Amino acid sequence: MQKKYFGTDGIRGKVGNSLINAEFMLKLGWAVGRVLANSHSATVLIGKDTRISGYMIESALQAGLSAAGVNIKLTGPMPTPAIAYLTNSVRADAGIVISASHNHYPDNGVKFFNKDGFKLSDELELAIEKQIDKPMKTVVADRLGKAARMNEAHGRYIEFCKSTFPSNLTLKGLKIVVDCANGAAYAVAPSIFHELGAEVVAIADDPDGFNINQTCGATDTAHLQEMVVKHNADVGIAFDGDGDRLIMVDHHGLRVDGDELLCIMAIDRFYLKENAPLGVVGTIMSNLGLEQTLKRHHIAFERSPVGDRYVLDLMQQKGWFLGGESSGHIVDLGFTTTGDGVITALQILRIMQQAEKPLADLKKVMVKNPQVLINVPIKGILDIAQNPNIKKAITEAEKQLNGAGRILLRPSGTEPVIRVMVEGSDEGIVRQTAEMLAAAVQQSTL
């Protein structure tokens, strides 16, 4: 059955539209509560990022859950992976995160975790949707849910993250620039690295409700790259608005993406022979260089559709524990149930300290193929497969690559854009081909 409200990662959109408003969020909270009503004294954890609209959505969800007889624990601004961890840790029945991840402040959304800290199954999402379409009824007064602040949430998550770093190792001697994207990680990430001994320069750590992901964070690392060079830092770390993805910067000020970080982690495990990976999951967007490097080390590699949910699904099907995306979502089931930017950063820093090598040297393990990604804004729905102009452009692009590359056009699951990706052996031809395809898509939207 096709879902009516849920997308690839919860429910997301422009604040004030038909879904991201107080009325719908009230009903959504009630619907979630109804699905959990079979649980005795059900409790739901709610966290959020730093968007101004988070207050409205939090209040509406809280009212709906209470009306269904469910208790609520409120953490305030916390990274998405923190809610996944804490939901399981405090034995809550579900966790809710109010966030639109890497999008700017006019957008917001809601995503969910089950009691084990994993994202909801399709069956549960459909059950919630079924309740949304029913008339809302409030339980009697003595069964209303109660709400309480979880003041210890920050401290518990900080200690959990530190527990994933070897106790006989510190970050002393490292200077780290941390870009918090003016998002959910601002109150916890700098403290974690500082408590482990690093000298920390925090940037984009002053959210005002409107500046989340604004010229900062994992999707815009230009300022971080400048600051790493300016401060003569060893490494730069960039999170996105909800802290579940990570991009790093080496001491030369050069960006290190999710494919490279995933490769470093996989090869490290391979040589340590501790939990050596049987295989690694990437996506259809992952650089071919990642696949080639892993196969040289006899590590299997499989591609899933884009989205950390699909990465995790394939990991679980294969029985593998490591996977991720070029964008910086990296899932390590040895530590977490979802992508966690802080924990991924700690693993890379551990490798740097143990190997006594800078990130610039570690990333040399993988040679990236030239790859160009262009996001083309669209209005409405564009059928890529049936559009004659786009089909003609793809045929021409395949001729230009001459069998030595990959072409991928796909609609984003989170933004109104078509993503055009071209990969090949010659950077000039790759860029020219990508720009030609992007122009064809743009022309088709007029």
Swiss-Prot record:
Cofactor(s) this protein requires: Mg(2+)
Modified residues (Phosphoserine): S101
PTM text: Activated by phosphorylation.
GO molecular function ontology, one term from the record: magnesium ion binding
GO BP annotation list: carbohydrate metabolic process; peptidoglycan biosynthetic process; UDP-N-acetylglucosamine biosynthetic process
Record-listed Mg(2+) binding positions: S101, D240, D242, D244
Keywords, alphabetical: Isomerase, Magnesium, Metal-binding, Phosphoprotein
Active site: S101 (phosphoserine intermediate)
EC number of the protein: 5.4.2.10
GO (cellular component) term, any one: cytosol
Described function: Catalyzes the conversion of glucosamine-6-phosphate to glucosamine-1-phosphate.
Protein name per the record: Phosphoglucosamine mutase
Species for this entry: Coxiella burnetii (strain Dugway 5J108-111)
Gene: glmM
